[in-house]
Amino acid sequence: MNIAILFGGSSFEHEISIVSAITMKKVLKKSTLTYIFVSADRKFYLIDTEKINSKLFSSGEYKKGKQLVLKNDGFFTKGMFGSKQVAFDVLLNLIHGRDGEDGKVASMMEFFNIPYISPRLEASAMSYNKLYTKFLAESLGVKTVPYEHLSKNGDRKISMEYPVIIKPVRLGSSIGVSIVKSEAELDYALDVAFEFDNDVIVEPFIDGVKEFNQAGCHTGDWELSIVEEPQKEEFLDFEKKYMDFSRDSQVLSADISEELKNNIQVTFKKIYDPLFMGSIIRCDFFVVNDEILLNEINPIPGSMANYLFPDFEGMVWRLSKALPKEKNISIDYTYIHSIQSAKGKA
């Protein structure tokens, strides 16, 4: 199978996307990979799979590659004798953050009739914005961590007790995130967060909370990852998350009861189906007093959370054959013809 990897984008997580994309070479070994890079100024470049490495992008060498245009049914190179389509079977969206997770890529792929693995438009909107994720969870009967919402031009007062954690609403990878232990630290933390976003959510910082990650998709049958208990530190900053996104070897399953595992997976399915059909997502959960709370939805997890699956590549192949399809609309202009006919008789 030929899989196009779309990565980069005009995003604060641009570099993490590059790391995720390079990692796919180690993971999708049986597939033919076609790399399509989106520069910070949103131009498309075809990248030589054999030559892809991080320096290619930091040095600007990627600009020597073929520039692509997006048209109906795919990406095309431009030449003296016309355009040539870039061949692939399915596109894997690996743009983290803005462009990739906010619905822009989903909209383009749908509009230009390109098969793709990624959340669709509505799912992107609900999972990219942490505030909307809270609303989604509430509508599904899934409990979340308590929160308050602050806007850049609004009041900076919070009512919950310290310590708290400040998160930009539309960012991942711990960018702009701070733990605030007292009121004296609040203004600075908000200044940092508002550098990246106009809205933040404030949540209680729960010291020593049990955290579990569950990834999966639906390919006609449920394909769920192991339940992972990630490394426990007070806070995983951007650097640690950056390294985390390059993982390519499977991790061990969390040592938890079968009942807790089943409850986490039932909650995951409730979130995934039907909104996230056609995508591989990861949900991060907290367990507090035996209660499962949704922390975040990762619509395009780092390196696609490949390390949580025993057969990630096989799953990608199966998912590519089970993607949701838009209904074709037949337009025959009957209404306009009837108006024209009526006018002709008048």
Swiss-Prot record:
Mg(2+) 2 binds at residues 296, 298. It comes from Sulfurovum sp. (strain NBC37-1). The lineage of its organism: Bacteria, Pseudomonadati, Campylobacterota, Epsilonproteobacteria, Campylobacterales. Its EC number is 6.3.2.4. Mg(2+) 1 binds at residues 284, 296. Belongs to the D-alanine--D-alanine ligase family. This is D-alanine--D-alanine ligase. GO terms for biological process: cell wall organization; peptidoglycan biosynthetic process; regulation of cell shape. PANTHER family: D-ALANINE--D-ALANINE LIGASE (PTHR23132), D-ALANINE--D-ALANINE LIGASE B (PTHR23132:SF23). Residues 134-340 form the ATP-grasp domain. Pfam families: Dala_Dala_lig_C (PF07478), Dala_Dala_lig_N (PF01820). Gene3D superfamilies: 3.40.50.20, ATP-grasp fold, A domain, ATP-grasp fold, B domain. Its cofactor is Mg(2+); Mn(2+). Cell wall formation. ATP binds at residues 161-212. Keywords: ATP-binding, Cell shape, Cell wall biogenesis/degradation, Cytoplasm, Ligase, Magnesium, Manganese, Metal-binding, Nucleotide-binding, Peptidoglycan synthesis. GO terms for cellular component: cytoplasm. Pathway: Cell wall biogenesis; peptidoglycan biosynthesis. GO terms for molecular function: ATP binding; D-alanine-D-alanine ligase activity; metal ion binding. It catalyses: 2 D-alanine + ATP = D-alanyl-D-alanine + ADP + phosphate + H(+). InterPro entries: ATP-grasp, ATP_grasp_subdomain_1, D-Ala_lig_Van_CS, D_ala_D_ala, Dala_Dala_lig_C, Dala_Dala_lig_N, PreATP-grasp_dom_sf. It is found in: Cytoplasm. Binds 2 magnesium or manganese ions per subunit.
